[in-house]
Amino acid sequence: MLLKLESDTEHDLSIAFMLTFRCNYDCSYCESHDVNHPLNNKPPKSISDALNYVTSFYQNKSIIINILGGEPFLYKNIFNMFNNLEERIDIKVTTNLSFTLDFIKKTFNNTKINIKASFHPEYADPYEFVKKVKYLQQNNFNITSNISMHPNKSHFEKAIYILENLPRSKPHILSNMSVNGLIFGDSFSYSPSQIKTIKKYSGSLKKYIKCTYPDNIKYVTHQDLISKNLDNFKG
């Protein structure tokens, strides 16, 4: 069983903050959401004040806060929260980018925000997704894309379209929902040709993750971590 995961980072401190469990998608393979979870209605300043307080213990350190969900942009005051965070804090937000391009044009004006856009083929339109990502790239946002590789033929083809049209995107191997008390079940059953395709688009991913087990330490790629079911923690 896996005891600990460690990955290289450009920051001295990385904080993962779950802004909301609520999501407008209900993907069959996702455990990090609840379509019925109450929306976060806390004042934005109370959230940013709490995050500023935590980071105040790490003066002269480089810090990034990763805003997670659910879907973080369901929190209507998210931009006010961003604006109240101290300047020294870098911000990354993981989003399914399901809002309209018009919404992006009207509201996205803080290029300090790093965006990790995730494509989910059970719900998202690949053509609209590409349009939104390209618009943000053209307007100087630092945006990367994680593309969920569902083995269903139609879903897989949607993912390939995005990987072909967004050079900074990368494939994300999926796991089934948890079984037998493990965090994840086995990875989906991909055909040999699908595995070959995933490897093709994973060629530029050289980042390794340090995995600590009871009897040894391994350095594995993110793709191997998921596809070979190495991500089941003890407990």
Mark where each language-model region is:
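N-terminal [4Fe-4S]-dependent radical SAM core
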Residues: 1-16, 223-235
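Conserved N-terminal glycine/acidic-rich loop preference
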Residues: 3-11, 28-29, 108, 132, ...
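Canonical Radical SAM [4Fe-4S] cluster-binding loop centered on the CxxxCxxC motif
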Residues: 6-47
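Core AdoMet radical
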Residues: 34-45, 60-75, 86-101, 110-129, ...
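A short, N-terminal amphipathic alpha-helix
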Residues: 50-58
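Acidic (Asp/Glu)-rich catalytic clusters
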Residues: 57-58, 82-86, 104-112, 131-140, ...
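A short acidic (Asp/Glu
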Residues: 76-79, 103-105, 155-159
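Radical SAM enzyme [4Fe-4S]-AdoMet core and its adjacent flexible, acidic
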Residues: 118-235
